[in-house]
Amino acid sequence: MFIDIHAHAYRKAFFQAPGRRPWPNADQLIEFYDKHEVEKAVLLPLIGPEFYLPQSNEDILEAAERFPGRFIPFCNIHPQAIYNDPFSKLEDVFKQYRDAGCKGVGEVICNMSFFDPFMTNLFRAIEEMQWPMTIHVAHRYGRCYGIYDEPGLPGLAETLQRFPGMKVFAHSQTFWAEIAVLDTPHERAGYPKGKVIEGAVPKLMRKYENLYGDLSAGSGCNALTRDEEYAVKFLNEFQDKLMFGIDICSAPGEPHHVSLMNFLKKLLAEGKISQTVFNKIAKENAIRLLGL
C-alpha cells in the first residue's frame, strides 16, 4: 500500500540521542513495515558533522542487499568531499554509487547556504546524474542541521531555477511551516498550528516543476492536519508532487509513526480524496520518480 520515501537505519541500533530512544536498524524497520503495509522504503544515509552520528553509504547498501526489494538505497557525500574544493567532480563518486544500485542523493543536511559554492557544486553534480535529491531545510546556522534558507525560501527557489534537471524532495519543519504565511520567522523552527493562508511552499510547487513534497516526519503531517480543509485542496492540487514518508528516528512503533498514514486513510474513507489521489501519494509518485 505504501512506499516510505524517507527512512533511516543504522547497522546496530545502539546509539541514543539525548531524550530519544535508540535509532532503528534495518530489521526493526522491516518488522514495522510488515505490520503497516509499507512495501518499500527509500533508505537515506546520514553523513557529516552536523548530525549526531554519521554513517557510511556502505551501511545503506548492505541493508538493501540483506532485504532485496524492500529498501531503495540513496547515497550521500558532503559537498567538501574529495579535495575540499568547490570544483571537485563529485559526480565521479556518484557514478560509482549509481553502479552499486543507488537511486538518488540524500538526506542532504549540510548546515550551509543554498548559495555556498560547495553546495552549488553538489547540485551541479546531482543534476548531471539526473538524480533526485532529498533535502532538509534549516532555519538557522549552528545548533541545527540542514541547508539554511531565509523566510520565503529564496535560496530554494533560486536553486530550483538554476538546476531545473535536479528533482528536489524537500522536507523539514522549516520547509513545511511555509505551507502558510508565517506569523513570525520563529515559526519555521517548529510545528505551527492554525488555519493556512497560502505561503511559499504551494507557490513554489506551482512555479517549479522540479520541486516535490516529502511528507515525512511530524512536519509534513502537521502541515496537513493543522487545517484539514486546506489539506484536501493541497493534496488534490499537488497529487503528482507529494510522497508519503515516515522518517523514523527511534525504535519503530511510536504513535506519530502512523499519524500520516492514518490521516490519509481517513480522508480516503470520507471521500475527501479519491483512490487515485491516495495511490499516487502513497506509492505511485515514488515509483514514477525513482523509476522503480
Question: What residue ranges belong to the model's regions?
Answer:
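Mid-to-C-terminal alpha-helical segments outside catalytic/metal-binding sites
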Residues: 1-40, 239-243, 249-292
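Mobile, glycine- and charge-enriched loop segments
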Residues: 1-20, 57-86, 201-202, 209-212
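Active-site neighborhood of phospho(di)ester-bond hydrolases with catalytic His/Asp-centered motifs
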Residues: 2-5, 42-45, 74-76, 106, ...
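Catalytic pocket-lining loop regions of alpha/beta-barrel enzymes
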Residues: 104, 119-244
